[in-house]
């Protein structure tokens, strides 16, 4: 059987770099970012330089693609214009290019920051209202809505993965709850690209974490079986945590320092709020 052709945006970034060796044997990868091609392309990888804010560069990128893994865009908090150009306008540009190219599958790299203002004492699934903790988180909530729209309106099949933190091991105490090993993310992406019954799935990008704040039943129902556990790295994570000072706001909410930045809210009200289900 011929291998599927899958476009990966943001391929030069940290997550893309960790995913490439894990997906290159399974798909023909069309890697893309704003800069020039790296010098380590594998035989099943090719490179297309493109910019999410330049629609003319996206049509040639998406031509012939069976699927899109969209990691591109701004990946941390910034002022609204900086986030919105790639993550709002740019996201619609790449979705439109995918639709025009007849690409059926989209994996959208959403983020835990779409729900970052849930207290750490709450266990949440994917059927609760979004609670973004930053302009960045708002852009990820928008992205989930856009994927839902493309699935309903144009019959595309999308998976929004609310990624926790992708690394070889969890970096601190917060990451013990939200960490995902790159092997497990690659497994989840493969499910999103291949499972026959996906319309728009929202799942958490997390490994098997004892301290998880999330009910990842939606991913498990699709066959996701994470092989890594944050608790195996607890000594490392806690040693790193000890180097960080306490954060009066960030330590209460799932989004951590993203919640604390520029915070002038009411902690008690946010902790106790019960939002209506969407
Ligand atoms: C994210 O969504 C960011 O892209 C990444 O840089 C980390 O900050 C991660 O969340 C996290 O919450 O650890």
Role assignments for model-derived ranges:
Residues 53, 82-93, 101, 112, ...:
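Glycine-rich NAD(P)-binding loop of the Rossmann-fold in SDR/ketoreductase-type enzymes
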Residues 4-25:
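N-terminal Rossmann NAD(P)H-binding glycine-rich loop of SDR-like oxidoreductase domains
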Residues 93-131:
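Conserved Rossmann-fold NAD(P)-dependent oxidoreductase catalytic core, especially the SDR/UDP-sugar
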Residues 45, 49-86:
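NAD(P)H-binding glycine-rich loop region in Rossmannoid oxidoreductase-like domains
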Residues 27-38:
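Conserved glycine-rich Rossmann-like NAD(P)H-binding loop of the short-chain dehydrogenase/reductase
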Residues 163-169, 179-201, 208:
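Alpha-helical substrate-binding/gating segment
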Residues 208-225, 240-268, 272-273:
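Conserved C-terminal active-site "lid" loop/helix of NAD(P)H-dependent oxidoreductases
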Residues 85, 119-155:
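Catalytic helix-loop patch of NAD(P)-dependent Rossmann-fold dehydrogenases
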């Amino acid at each position: 059987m011929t291998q599927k052709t899958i476009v990966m945006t943001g391929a030069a970034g940290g997550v893309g770099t960790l995913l490439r060796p894990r997906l290159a044997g399974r798909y023909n990868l069309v890697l893309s970012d704003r800069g020039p091609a790296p010098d380590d392309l594998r035989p099943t990888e090719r490179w297309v330089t493109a910019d999410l804010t330049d629609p003319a560069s996206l049509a040639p990128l998406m031509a012939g693609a069976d699927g899109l893994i969209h990691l591109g865009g701004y990946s941390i908090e910034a002022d609204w214009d900086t986030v919105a150009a790639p993550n709002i306008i740019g996201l619609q540009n790449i979705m439109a290019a995918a639709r025009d190219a007849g690409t059926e599958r989209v994996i959208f790299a959403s983020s835990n920051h779409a729900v970052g203002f849930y207290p750490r004492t709450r266990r949440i699934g994917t059927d609760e209202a979004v609670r973004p903790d930053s302009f960045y988180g708002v852009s990820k909530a928008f992205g989930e809505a856009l994927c839902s729209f493309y699935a309903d309106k144009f019959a595309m099949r999308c998976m929004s993965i609310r990624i926790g933190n992708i690394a070889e091991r969890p970096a601190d105490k917060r990451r013990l709850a939200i960490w995902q090993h790159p092997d497990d993310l690659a497994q989840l992406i493969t499910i999103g690209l291949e499972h026959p019954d996906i319309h728009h799935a929202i799942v958490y990008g997390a490994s098997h974490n004892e301290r998880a704040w999330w009910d990842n039943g939606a991913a498990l129902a699709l066959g996701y079986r994470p092989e890594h556990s944050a608790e195996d790295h607890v000594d490392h994570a806690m040693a790193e945590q000890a180097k960080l000072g306490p954060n009066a706001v960030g330590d209460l909410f799932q989004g951590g320092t993203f919640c604390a930045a520029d915070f002038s809210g009411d902690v008690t009200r946010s902790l106790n709020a019960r939002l209506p289900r969407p």
